[in-house]
């Protein structure tokens, strides 16, 4: 009795499953005329092909465990689980999904290609701009080479003409010149303090023109005198050498002449002709045959003759 009731229950369950499959998939025995639903029909056939096999497995399990009432209850629960899989509400269209995916991929490819085109176009230069850039760079290099050639021509003892050597030697040469200029400036400051504006009147020469005579003298600036032998020889060649210096109404006269008798008297007599008041005078021997005569005089308010004329008269007096 138990076995017969169990078999009847299995038959009823199988009929219920087949009815549900037919209601869920009415197109199993028909050919589909809608091209858009081919994938849907194929899915239905796959489900029909899979579920009988599962049912056969459950039937085998049921036959093997038909001796116990617990096996019937477990098979019933399995049958209910199989029924719950066939939900008619969850229908998908894989064709539409594949079309949407292919459209999305094509759109992404188009956007990517447009971005690449924009980047490539932005990175490129116009042909005429590129040509102008090349010409400007060429001119710049040409000017740079010309400047380097001119600089290398100014550098003494240049061994190599490459850019690095030229620049290095130029820097060294400039540093040497700066040091030299600094030394010369220091020497100039020192000598400027010692220098004095001195009028040197050399030997007078007489130029005869008809019955009149004129005296010409050469004036130059000189540094303070030294006691070296070279200076002494120069003094002997240019003697008598007369220096005159004016400060306000004072006139300082210094005469370098050979040691002769009556030199001081001749000089003082020539100064009296110009009505110059002698304030102080002294004589110093310089070497064996040279005298240094220094005379300080004061000019009155009526004195208007130039100092050069006084010097010429002193020279003429010493030459007599």
Curated annotation (Swiss-Prot):
InterPro entries: bHLH_dom, bHLH_transcription_regulator, HLH_DNA-bd_sf. Disulfide bonds: none annotated. Its main location: nucleus. The keyword Nucleus applies. One of its GO terms (cellular component) is nucleus. It holds the Pfam family HLH. Residues 53-105 are annotated as: Disordered. It is found in: Nucleus. Residues 81-105 have a biased composition (Polar residues). Expressed constitutively in roots, leaves, stems, and flowers. Residues 128-177 form the bHLH domain. The keyword Transcription regulation applies. One of its GO terms (molecular function) is DNA-binding transcription factor activity. Transcription activator that regulates the expression of at least NAI2, PYK10 and PBP1. Required for and mediates the formation of endoplasmic reticulum bodies (ER bodies). Involved in the symbiotic interactions with the endophytes of the Sebacinaceae fungus family, such as Piriformospora indica and Sebacina. Homodimer. This is Transcription factor NAI1. It comes from Arabidopsis thaliana. The gene is NAI1.
């Amino acid at each position: 009795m138990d076995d017969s009731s169990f078999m009847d229950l299995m038959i009823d369950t199988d009929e219920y499953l087949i009815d549900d499959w037919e209601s869920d998939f009415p197109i199993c025995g028909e050919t589909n005329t809608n091209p858009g639903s081919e994938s849907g029909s194929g899915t239905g056939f796959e489900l029909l092909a899979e579920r009988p096999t599962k049912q056969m497995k459950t039937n085998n399990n049921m036959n093997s465990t038909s001796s116990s009432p617990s096996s019937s209850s477990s098979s019933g629960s399995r049958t209910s689980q199989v029924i719950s899989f066939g939900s008619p509400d969850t229908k998908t269209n894989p064709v539409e999904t594949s079309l949407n995916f292919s459209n999305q991929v094509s759109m992404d490819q188009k956007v990517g290609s447009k971005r690449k085109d924009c980047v490539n176009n932005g990175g490129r230069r116009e042909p005429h701009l590129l040509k102008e850039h090349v010409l400007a760079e060429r001119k710049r290099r040409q000017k740079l080479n010309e400047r380097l050639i001119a600089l290398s021509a100014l550098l003494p003892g240049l061994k190599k003409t490459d850019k690095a050597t030229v620049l290095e030697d130029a820097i060294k040469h400039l540093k040497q010149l700066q040091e030299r200029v600094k030394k010369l400036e220091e020497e100039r400051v020192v000598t400027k303090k010692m220098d004095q504006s001195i009028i040197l009147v050399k030997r007078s020469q007489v130029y005869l023109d008809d019955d009149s005579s004129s005296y010409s003298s050469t004036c130059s600036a000189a540094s303070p005198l030294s006691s070296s032998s070279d200076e002494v020889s120069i003094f002997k060649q240019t003697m008598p050498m007369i220096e005159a210096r004016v400060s306000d109404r004072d006139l300082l006269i210094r005469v370098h002449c050979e040691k002769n008798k009556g030199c001081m008297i001749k000089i003082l007599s020539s100064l009296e002709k110009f009505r110059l008041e002698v304030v102080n005078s002294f004589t110093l021997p310089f070497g064996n045959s040279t005298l240094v005569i220094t005379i300080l005089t004061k000019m009155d308010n009526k004195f208007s003759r130039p100092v050069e004329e006084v010097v010429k008269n002193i020279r003429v007096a010493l030459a007599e």
